[in-house]
Regions:
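Class I SAM-dependent methyltransferase Rossmann-like catalytic core
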Residues: 1-37
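Conserved class I S-adenosyl-L-methionine
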Residues: 37-47
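S-adenosyl-L-methionine
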Residues: 68-115
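Conserved SAM-binding loop of SAM-dependent methyltransferases across substrates and taxa
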Residues: 48-60
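Glycine-centered, small-residue-biased loops immediately flanking beta-strands
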Residues: 39, 63, 146
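Glycine-rich helix-loop-beta junction characteristic of Rossmann-like nucleotide cofactor-binding loops
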Residues: 30-36, 101-102, 140-141
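Class I S-adenosyl-L-methionine
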Residues: 152-195
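Mobile active-site "lid"/loop adjacent to the S-adenosyl-L-methionine
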Residues: 85-88, 103-145, 156
Length: 195
């Protein structure tokens, strides 16, 4: 739920982004240049579409963004967004994602969050499991040398998961964008150079 006094909420409304999360991706991309013109991008857990909007703007009309979520996401202006409604862990949904892209992904984005219970240890464990599912998806559909960006909730399970990521990527960094709420336990893991 958005806090109406939140400056990023207000900025998103003013600038036409579907969520304040758009600024997290904008900031990460400005610093790390993970998105480029013509790229093929998957946005896992894309609802409501803020990250897909940003990715679509950067990759341009020669690129493609394939968004997947269990919640219906409205079309995004620009014509380079394809939405697939469903659970990305299911084989038939994965097949739709792959055939929609037509080639391996250059970048896989995931700002996905589990349904939060308010029990920090449980929510963090569910976050790690979701991230493991995204990593497994990336193992199959991300091109060699590609980039994976994941949101995760900090906790005791993260260290072990970082080791898993380092087995699959040349470089793994933890990021906390300034647009992320200070009180939030979320961080982003940027994984570059898929092995």
């Amino acid at each position: 739920m958005y806090i109406r006094k939140d400056p990023f909420y207000k900025k998103a409304k003013r600038e036409g982004y579907r969520s304040r999360a758009a600024y997290k991706l904008i900031e990460i991309n400005e610093k790390h240049r993970i998105l480029k013109n013509g790229y093929c991008v998957a946005d896992i857990g894309c609802f409501p579409g803020g990250w897909a909007q940003v990715a679509g703007e950067v990759i341009g009309e020669k690129g493609i963004v394939v968004g997947v979520d269990v919640k219906k996401t409205q079309p995004i202006a620009g014509g380079n967004f394809i939405f697939i409604e469903g659970d990305f862990t299911l084989p038939d949904v994965r097949q739709k994602i792959s055939s929609s892209a037509g080639r391996p992904f250059d970048v896989i984005l995931s700002d996905i969050s589990p349904d939060l219970s308010g029990i920090k240890i449980r929510d963090q464990a569910l976050s790690v499991e979701l991230c493991r599912s995204v990593l497994e998806f990336a193992g199959e559909f991300l091109k060699n040398g590609g980039t994976l960006l994941l949101k995760i909730f900090q906790g005791s399970d993260v260290k072990g998961f970082l080791d898993e990521l380092r087995n699959s990527f040349k470089d793994v960094k933890i990021l906390k964008p300034s647009s992320s709420r200070k009180e939030s336990g979320e961080v982003y893991i940027l994984c570059s150079g898929k092995k």
